[in-house]
């Protein structure tokens, strides 16, 4: 995104100097939390502009994003394939996914395979849709967003994978008992 497009994306109800100061604070807070997951500030700011809700005033968006600056930064860095960000996301947010999946009615036997499918859906995407992490907009914490994404997805594996080798073996055993 060029500088003019970036400027237009953020121009509505905040003075230029206030906007610049707010964006600098966002970038500084994010870099402080995830120093190894380096992302160009212009890339981060451009992605923040894309995460404004339809009709959301700039001042409100900046306040919301300030509350979740570090989480937004991590999500954007993951979306852009920054290895340190992906490792941090795995450690900080995906560790609880298998436990969460085991609590779902259909998740007890499929937790490990489903957790890998969730990771792929969040960080890689598929042919029809890019990585879901790109949809995180800072309306609440990233951990909560991950939990909601897991539960709404009901831990279904991506199309065409059928849950991996373990799931295929379980289905084969179930058919044999049928």
Residue ranges of each PLM-predicted region?
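Intrinsic, short, N-terminal disordered tails of RNA polymerase sigma-factor systems
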Residues: 1-178
């Amino acid at each position: 995104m060029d500088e003019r497009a970036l400027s237009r994306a953020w121009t509505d109800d905040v003075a230029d100097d206030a906007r610049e100061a707010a964006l600098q604070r966002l970038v500084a807070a994010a870099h402080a939390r995830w120093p190894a997951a380096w992302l160009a500030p212009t890339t981060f700011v451009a992605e923040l502009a894309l995460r404004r809700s339809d009709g959301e005033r700039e001042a409100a968006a900046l306040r919301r994003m300030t509350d979740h600056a570090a989480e937004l930064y991590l999500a954007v860095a993951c979306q852009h394939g920054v290895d340190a960000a992906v490792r941090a996301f795995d450690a900080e947010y995906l560790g609880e996914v298998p436990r969460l999946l085991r609590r779902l009615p259909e998740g007890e036997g499929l937790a490990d395979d489903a957790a890998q499918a969730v990771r792929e859906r969040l960080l890689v995407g598929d042919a029809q849709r890019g990585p879901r992490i790109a949809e995180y907009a800072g309306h609440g914490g990233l951990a909560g967003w991950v939990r909601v994404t897991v539960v709404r997805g009901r831990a279904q594996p991506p199309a065409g994978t059928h849950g991996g080798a373990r799931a295929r073996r379980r289905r084969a055993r179930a058919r044999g008992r049928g």
